[in-house]
């Protein structure tokens, strides 16, 4: 539910944005209208807003190489509508500040090229956290998040010479073209050379209705694997974060928690964390969200049985409801490849 299957042809990355819009305008608008009907909300509406994510869908899996934008469709008026719709001001402003930062990085080209360069958005976040006397992003309050949005937009104006776009469709077209263009970013080109993936294959762009892992303590986001990618062991595993969005899991801002009790206890032992501290501060999803865990475990089994291979999956929990974002055949070590293939053969899943 809520998926927009929209954009097909990679040669668009060679065109200017105006040509891409002209070619795809009707297709995109029809697909957005379909998603609006499914989600019973409206893109760009200030009373019942639909927010979307824009992500790549390359023919061959390229984990972490392509760009993604979340929470697209927000502006100063829509954020107030989101607050009225959800009754959750912190969530709405948190989503807004994340969107401005991602859009600035991916679409407006503000992400530093070199690690030594100052990231304007991260510098602002650290400044606000320091002034507030907190260490973690999720300790910031509504007024702090409003301040981040204000200062982020000022940074956009200063660096690009233009105001941050407020029109939902202007935001969407910028994101679509940026994701097409990310096929030719330096890390994606290098990855394709290493993996033997032809440049001509290109990528699709997928637009999905947003679900939110940052709506409070009954929401979460995570990644999981149907088998151990390092050893090939037939062991469901993964990581999740409560009250977070997908980028947080890999960004290292907070310590992710393990999906399973077994994985959580293994992690605690390696990290030198006592069982008492683990259970109190870093419980597994199996312990903290047992019903969601059961559903997740059942679905990962179903997906592996369907694709007949180890799966690498992304999911979000929004206020106690599980949503799957994507699945793909997982990358694995050479040793794991042999172990998984042997086990799948013995389990009758492959010939």
Q: What is each stretch, according to the model?
A:
Residues 1, 5-351:
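Nucleotide/phosphate-binding sheet-loop regions of phosphoryl- and nucleotidyl-transfer enzymes
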């Amino acid at each position: 539910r809520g998926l927009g299957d929209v954009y097909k042809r990679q040669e668009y990355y060679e065109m200017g944005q105006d040509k891409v819009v002209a070619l795809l305008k009707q297709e995109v608008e029809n697909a957005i209208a379909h998603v609006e009907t499914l989600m019973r909300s409206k893109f760009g509406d200030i009373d019942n807003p639909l927010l979307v994510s824009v992500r790549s869908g390359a023919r061959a899996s390229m984990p972490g190489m392509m760009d993604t934008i979340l929470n697209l469709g927000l502006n100063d008026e829509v954020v107030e509508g989101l607050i009225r719709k959800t009754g959750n001001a912190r969530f709405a402003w948190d989503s807004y500040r994340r969107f401005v930062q991602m859009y600035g990085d991916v679409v407006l080209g503000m992400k530093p090229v070199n690690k030594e360069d100052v990231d304007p958005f991260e510098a602002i976040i650290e400044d606000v956290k320091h002034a507030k006397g907190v260490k973690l992003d999720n300790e910031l309050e509504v007024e702090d998040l409003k301040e981040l949005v204000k200062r982020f937009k000022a940074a956009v104006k200063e660096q690009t010479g233009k105001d941050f776009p407020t029109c939902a469709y202007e935001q969407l077209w910028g994101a679509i073209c940026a994701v097409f263009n990310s096929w030719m970013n330096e890390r994606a080109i290098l990855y394709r050379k290493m993996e033997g993936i032809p440049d001509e294959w290109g990528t699709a762009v997928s637009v999905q209705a947003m679900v939110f892992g940052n709506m409070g303590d009954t929401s979460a986001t995570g990644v999981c694997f149907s088998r151990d990618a390092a050893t090939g062991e037939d062991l469901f595993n993964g990581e999740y974060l409560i009250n977070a969005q997908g980028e947080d899991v890999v960004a290292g801002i907070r310590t992710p928690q393990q999906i399973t009790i077994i994985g959580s206890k293994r992690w605690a032992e390696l990290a030198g964390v006592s069982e008492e501290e683990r259970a109190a501060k870093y419980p597994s999803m199996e312990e903290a969200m047992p019903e969601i865990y059961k559903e997740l475990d059942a679905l990962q089994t179903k997906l592996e049985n369907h694709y007949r291979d180890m799966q690498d999956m992304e999911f979000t929990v929004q206020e106690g409801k599980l949503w799957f974002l994507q699945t793909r055949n997982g990358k694995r070590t050479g040793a794991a490849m042999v172990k998984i293939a042997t086990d799948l053969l013995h389990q009758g899943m492959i010939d």
